[in-house]
A protein has these predicted regions:
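Glycine-enriched alpha-helix->loop->beta-strand junction motifs that scaffold or abut catalytic
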Residues: 66-70, 153-160, 175-181, 206-209
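Active-site glycine- and acidic-residue-rich loops that bind
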Residues: 47-58, 143-148, 152, 160-162, ...
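Hydrophobic residues within beta-strands of alpha/beta enzymes
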Residues: 1-3, 72, 161, 211
């Protein structure tokens, strides 16, 4: 699992001690240490870098140089573009975390502040991407919403288009050679929680290469069967979207992602119980790390 941690510049989306630079660094060091000790699954670190966090530039460079991360994504949650093209959705999101009245600011004041913040420069992002690639780290862009953004991603050296906002952008990203990612919860919900692209529709049209767990890990397995039963996708094709394709995107497909001679025996065995897929066995490096037996159900 690639554990995702965000480096935010402020507390727009709520106060979280996990998003401070000290906590992010501590978690990265902990995950790196766990990977070298006894563990049930493989652990990796995904740094989600908000480009309005100008102080994070030096932190990210240090973490890359110390080989603490295995993926980095450039995120821009500035209102008026990306995930928050619709300012009403932005207002609802901000209010969900803390009402503007409690902050003593009007929504317009908050909007102006976040639309005019200093950002990391193109040169800095390119430098981070180059340093990442030198250390065999995959680079992603987040919430791509225009074809122009994709062109910029190409200039920066981005590998992955993570959560493209529209199917047009997802299709273009796929055709340009980016790995395109959608969230599995999107499939279970029947669409984006932010009113953006439908993952199921994009998969049917061949615009999505990878499904990720996003904010609900259990959605990964369930979504594969929903796409088969409800939308007629083949199970092998869907499994590739959560195994082989992600492994290729992360540059680890030599050892992971498919059942082939010479690769690591990392396997998940599932069964159907009461109409829902359930995990019964997990094997890591050929060793069983989890086995679950459901009462009254023979496997």
């Amino acid at each position: 699992i690639y554990h995702s941690f965000s480096l935010y510049s402020d507390e727009l989306l709520g106060k979280s001690p996990l998003r401070t630079k000290e906590s992010v660094l501590e978690m990265a060091e902990l995950i790196a240490d766990i990977q070298n000790r006894s563990h049930l699954i493989h652990h990796r670190f995904h740094l989600r870098l908000e480009i309005d966090n100008v102080d994070a530039f030096a932190i990210a460079k240090d973490m890359i140089a110390r080989k603490l991360i295995q993926e980095i994504s450039f995120m821009d949650h500035t209102p008026g573009q990306g995930q928050y093209r619709d300012l009403e959705i932005y207002r609802e999101t901000v209010d969900k975390y803390h009402g503007m009245e409690n902050e003593g600011k009007t929504f317009e004041e908050v909007l102006e502040h976040h639309q005019n913040k200093k950002m990391l420069s193109i040169a800095q992002l390119r430098e981070l991407a180059e340093l990442a690639h030198q250390n065999h780290i995959t680079v992603a862009s987040h919430d791509d919403d225009t074809l122009e953004k994709l062109q910029l991603n190409r200039q920066l050296g981005v590998d992955i288009s993570e959560f493209p906002i529209t199917e047009e952008v997802a299709k273009a990203a796929h055709e340009m050679g980016f790995y395109t990612i959608a969230g599995a919860p999107n499939i279970l919900l029947g669409g984006s929680h932010s009113g953006n692209m439908s993952a199921a529709q994009a998969i049917q049209n061949g615009s999505v290469d990878i499904l990720c767990s996003d904010y609900f890990p259990q959605a990964l397995l369930h979504s594969l069967f929903v796409m088969r039963e409800k939308y007629g996708q083949t199970l092998p094709d869907m499994v590739n979207k959560v195994s082989l394709n992600p492994a290729k995107a992360m540059g680890i497909d030599k050892d992971y992602g498919s059942i082939e001679p010479g690769k690591k025996a990392d396997l998940v065995i599932a069964d159907i119980l009461d109409g829902y897929p359930v995990v019964t066995h997990v094997l890591v490096d050929g060793q069983t790390t989890s086995r679950v037996e459901y009462r009254g159900h023979s496997i």
